[in-house]
Swiss-Prot record:
Function: Component of the F(420)H(2) dehydrogenase (FPO complex) which is part of the energy-conserving F(420)H(2):heterodisulfide oxidoreductase system. The membrane-bound electron transfer system of the complex plays an important role in the metabolism of methylotrophic methanogens when the organisms grow on methanol or methylamines. Catalyzes the oxidation of methanophenazine to dihydromethanophenazine. It shuttles electrons from F(420)H(2), via FAD and iron-sulfur (Fe-S) centers, to methanophenazine (an electron carrier in the membrane).
Biological-process GO terms, alphabetical: methanogenesis; methanol metabolic process
Source species taxonomy: Archaea, Methanobacteriati, Methanobacteriota, Stenosarchaea group, Methanomicrobia
Keywords associated with the record: 2Fe-2S, Electron transport, Iron, Iron-sulfur, Metal-binding, Methanogenesis, Methanol utilization, Oxidoreductase, Transport
pH dependence per the UniProt record: Optimum pH is 8.5.
GO molecular function, one term: 2 iron, 2 sulfur cluster binding
Domain of life: Archaea
UniProt-recorded name of the protein: F(420)H(2) dehydrogenase subunit O
InterPro entries: F420H2-DH_FpoO
Species annotation: Methanosarcina mazei (strain ATCC BAA-159 / DSM 3647 / Goe1 / Go1 / JCM 11833 / OCM 88)
Binding-site residues, [2Fe-2S] cluster: 58, 63, 66
Coiled-coil ranges (or none): none
Family listed: Belongs to the FpoO family.
Free-text remark on how the cofactor is bound: Binds 1 [2Fe-2S] cluster.
Amino acid sequence: MTDCDLCGKGIPTVIPVRTYPPLLRFAYPEGVWKGLCETCLDSAQKTYLEVNRNHTSCRRGKCSLCGSKTGVFSVELQIPDFSKGIVRKDVDVCYRCLKLVDEAYIRYKREQIEQDHEQGRIHGHEHVHPH
């Protein structure tokens, strides 16, 4: 089990997102991997799309993924809680990390499609759905 780096939910596998923490840039010039659950990945990618579409202004803060003190955007998370069900919480993420989350989201969805496509070939033929 591993924990999501944004919401802390414990899950068997996380989706890797490369980040570039400013304090570690000399030790890790290629970046550091953070792990997100699918819900947090979806929320952060949704925020990225909204920022690009609406040109949302940022505010100064500390990014929850890379730790840089820069302009950040609010990402709404849905954190599971045994007593309250789902708790909504906002975390701050910088534009650079949002862009990296978007790349990870695209890569993750592409892998899911390829996996589904491969499962369709289990019996040696593709399942064709008429449209």
